[in-house]
Amino acid sequence: MPYVWCGLIMLALMPTHRPQHKHIQTQPQRTPTSVAASGGDARKMFDAGLTAFENEHNQAALDNWRRLARKEPRFPLVHLFISFATIDPQEQKRELRNAQALAPKVSKRDRLMIQWLSGVEQEQYVPAITAMNDLLASYPRDKHIVFLAGRWLSSQEQYEQASRLLQRATQLDPAYAAAWNQLAYCYAYTGDFSNAFTAMERYTALLPKDPNPQDSYAEILRMAGNYRDALEHYRKALQIDPAFQTSQLGIADTYALMGEEATARGEYDKAAGKANARSEQVGYEIQSALTYVRERKPKRSLALLDSAASQAHNAQASLLEAEAYRDMALIERDNQQSLKYLDKSSAALAEASGTPGPELHQERAEVLRLRAIRLAAAGKAEGAKQALKELDLLQQTTHGTALSRTYAGAMGSVLVASQRYAEAVPYLEEDTRNPLSMRDLIVAYTEVGATDRAHVLELKLAAFNQPTLEQALVVPELRTKLAATKEKRGWLRKLMGSD
């Protein structure tokens, strides 16, 4: 994490109000707004959208907020939250401009909220975090502000800091369902599944008729390697709402992780058949193509990804097109051919002018990362150095934590390719949520004699259960290796829930 972020985020976690006697009952602050009809229909419509947004029902939230924006065009927060939730790049830019134009005329709270969330969207992280801290200090008992801060920190993979804020949100309102959901994920991402399941039980009890709690429970069970129970909860979500697409995708991804690839492809087809947009359908087709990687049929996977890239291009989904070509570059063993796929990915990104900055920059960073690694593997040190230089400039310009980890992982993997193992270790240790970096770190640990660390990391990597291409390329092969190693077989069985 960039040093400036550390200090700013720690400010967010400091006490922001005087301690109160335990016997005094306090009420959470009501969220003030600048809308003229804040006590009437407009307020109710905004709150309905906010509740839907917090519980991952983005389309319902957007429907409420778009209606409100037409009714109350001078309500700044509705424009801000539309820009934050929409997947339409043009709408995102337009609504963000509307919110910023109204910012000078609104309350302190609304102004700080606009500074924070617009700063995040525009990758101006230092002023954004400063505004977030001011909000938390000025409105310490506003559960929505505390929750949104925790949610955003979680999205930046700052799980321990996020957990503290989300715990505070649940203390302000023990019935705050969305906070329990996000808190459960924070626990799960740090490996604390016991507390994750406890928080998830609270979440599902609070919203028994909502599909999202069952979907979240399923995902966390899957992260823990409990695939069968995960499938059961995904199916419960679909029983509540047969149109809840994330659970249909979750079923497909779970079968893929289980190694039941043909079944997974059938489930991806179901998801694609119910897709609301062509770009969404292409995304499912990309995931389906990855099942052939797990079956060790790379040519079939490459052919399907090439088709998906063409479809994405026709649908003007440049980011998906770039992702498909980058996936092809990852799968391709020949370095020269891999670099050609990366050229196509870069060309697609050049056409993605309407894509929000954070998403575009992260995809560009991943392309540069892989380019540097493949050039180093091909013995082209100067080319690798140039790619790393471009990646470093990108992460220094934006100060994003995800970009910083991508740079660290790229630097470490290039050093491993150059057999500079001791130098690689500290870089790779900054990117230990990426299976490719974890694999290279195991190699580096082994080469420098840190075999105990290598063994521990092998077990952690074997328990990685995210449905990504990186996982498909690394984890199944590692599990096979561990299963053949007598002294590690027992650990693997425990990790896979076989005992």
Model-assigned labels for residue ranges:
Residues 53-54, 87, 120, 154, ...:
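Position-specific recognition of the canonical hydrophobic site in helix A of tetratricopeptide repeat
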Residues 50, 84, 117, 151, ...:
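Residue-level recognition of tetratricopeptide repeat
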Residues 42, 76-77, 107-109, 143-144, ...:
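Helix-start (N-cap) detector for alpha-helical repeat units in TPR-like alpha-solenoids
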Residues 71, 102-105, 138-139, 171-172, ...:
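Structural marker of alpha-solenoid helical repeat scaffolds
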Residues 17-166, 172-178, 185, 190, ...:
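Acidic, proline/glycine-rich low-complexity intrinsically disordered segments
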